[in-house]
Amino acid sequence: MENKTILREWFERVDSEKTGNITATQLKSALAVGNLEFPLSVVQQMIRMYDSDRNGTMSFDEFVGLNKFLLKVQQVFSDLQRGRGYLVPDDVYEGLVKTGFSLDSPSFHTVCESFDRKKNGRIHLDDFISLCIFVQSARNLFNSFDTTKQGRVTLDFNQFVYFSANCRI
């Protein structure tokens, strides 16, 4: 959905309680209508990525940001899936590069394997979106610790646990 008017109408339908915010459960149900099935934990991570006021829900403006991200990731998937309906690891790597991520080989293979639910070397759209959400969340959190913008951070154990818990899916 690209048109803001259409997005607003969609958002208002999902916001059944008319609070101006949608919950993870409401967002999960709405995404399922569009054939995007995600575990609640992934939807909660989507909200955390764009929840600028940190209230645990998603306002319309926050939703617009998520929608833009999802459209970009879906387009990359569509461009690379070559009519198969899934990506192979080489496609996933290219897709990550096209979405602005750069991972070294060990990191890439670990992430790719962890999002290959069936362990068959095929990443479907929902898994690719989940993978991109994880990498984006990790990048956002890493950048918050990388105060000198050197591309390196030092974490004590408590910070590591905090980091890990915030990137969980």
Residue ranges and their predicted role:
Residues 114-117, 129:
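Alpha-helical scaffolds that organize eukaryotic protein assemblies
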Residues 139-169:
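C-terminal interaction modules of eukaryotic adaptor/scaffold proteins
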Residues 1-49, 54-94, 101-111, 125, ...:
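EF-hand Ca2+-binding helix-loop-helix modules
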